[in-house]
């Protein structure tokens, strides 16, 4: 096939645009889960099928988060091997932001579940030859108010960026988060 390669590829971009709204509609409409803002399917190397990120409003109850994690994991048999719940301030396309959320907002004993008896689905040969795989669900959402992000606020950073550019210094490439913001505390 001309469009089947290791992701990102033409086919994975097309699938992502098609699948993400379908997953979102499944969680919101079919399952009636409140607080779901967005569903993102991780593309580079995983090819959309293995890692799913569900973005929630800050005030979403824990019960709704777990309903969505299970719902995303089992909606489509070959998708959702790893499902991560995050809040709106986390960019699901930024692996550093996801790792930060997992490191600071997740307690593995309370916020991680592993589920067995998952089919392997389509993909490259695995390390083991068995028929079964497993699922990993992670709640990396805020469990309460947190201190503000330890960076100057947006007006200060924007002014600093303007001064930087006025001085003719090398072009900046800001990455989120590039300014501090309130996390409720």
Regions found by a protein language model. Give the residues of each.
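Charged, compositionally biased interaction regions
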Residues: 1-185
């Amino acid at each position: 096939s001309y469009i089947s390669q290791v992701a990102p590829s033409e086919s994975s971009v097309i699938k992502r645009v098609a699948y993400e709204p379908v997953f979102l509609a499944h969680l919101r409409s079919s399952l009636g889960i409140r607080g779901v803002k967005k569903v993102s399917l991780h593309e580079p190397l995983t090819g959309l099928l293995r890692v799913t990120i569900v973005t929630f409003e800050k005030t979403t109850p824990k019960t709704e988060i777990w309903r969505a994690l299970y719902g995303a994991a089992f909606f489509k048999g070959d998708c959702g091997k790893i499902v991560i719940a995050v809040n709106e301030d986390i960019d699901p396309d930024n692996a550093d932001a996801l790792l930060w959320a997992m490191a600071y907002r997740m307690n593995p004993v309370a916020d991680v579940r592993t589920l067995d008896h998952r089919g392997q689905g389509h993909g490259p040969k695995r390390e083991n030859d068995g028929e079964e795989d497993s699922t990993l669900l992670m709640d990396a959402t805020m469990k309460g108010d947190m201190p503000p992000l330890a960076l100057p606020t947006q007006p200060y950073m924007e002014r600093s960026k303007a001064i930087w550019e006025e001085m003719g210094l090398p072009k900046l490439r800001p990455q989120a988060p590039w300014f501090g913001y309130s996390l409720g505390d």
